[in-house]
C-alpha cells in the first residue's frame, strides 16, 4: 500500500521517536519533494536532519508530475494531495484542517497524526494490534 505524507505527521513522529510506525502500518510512505525541503529547512529540528541523512526503508521521495495551482494550500499540502492522486495512494497523511477538507473533496482517504488511526486504510499488519 502507498500512503503520501505531508510535513506535520513526519515532524511529530520524529519528535516523539515513533517515525518507524508509518511503514509498519501503511507500507510505502511517499514523501513529496516539497515536504522533504521543509523537513530539512534551516530551522528544522536536528532529529529531522539525522533521520534524513539515510532515509529508512519504507520511505521514498517523489515529485508530483503536475501541481494544481488552483489549490489554495501551502506547497507541501498541495504536492501531497496531487501526488496522492497521481500514485493512487491508499491515503494521504495530513493534519491541517483546510488540507484535509480539500483532500476529502477530491476523493482521497485522509489520515491524521492522531485521531484517524483507529482504523488505518487497508492495514493488514499485526503491528496495529500492539498500539
Stretches found by the model and what they are:
Residues 1-91, 97, 104-108:
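Active-site-proximal, substrate-binding regions of enzyme catalytic domains
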Residues 35-36, 100-131:
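Acidic, PIN/NYN-like endoribonuclease modules and their adjacent C-terminal/linker elements
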Amino acid at each position: 500500500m502507498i500512503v503520501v505524507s505531508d510535513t506535520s505527521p513526519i515532524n511529530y513522529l520524529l519528535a516523539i521517536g515513533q517515525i518507524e510506525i508509518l511503514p509498519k502500518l501503511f507500507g510505502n510512505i511517499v514523501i513529496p519533494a516539497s515536504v522533504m525541503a521543509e523537513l530539512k529547512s534551516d530551522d528544522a529540528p536536528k532529529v529531522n536532519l539525522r533521520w534524513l541523512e539515510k532515509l529508512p526503508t519504507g520511505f521514498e521521495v517523489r515529485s508530483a508530475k503536475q501541481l494544481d495551482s488552483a489549490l489554495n494550500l501551502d506547497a507541501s499540502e498541495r504536492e501531497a494531495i496531487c501526488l496522492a492522486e497521481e500514485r493512487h495512494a491508499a491515503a494521504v497523511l495530513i493534519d491541517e484542517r483546510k488540507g484535509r477538507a480539500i483532500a476529502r473533496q477530491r476523493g482521497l482517504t485522509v489520515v491524521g497524526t492522531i485521531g484517524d488511526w483507529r482504523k488505518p486504510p487497508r492495514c493488514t499488519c499485526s503491528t496495529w494490534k500492539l498500539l
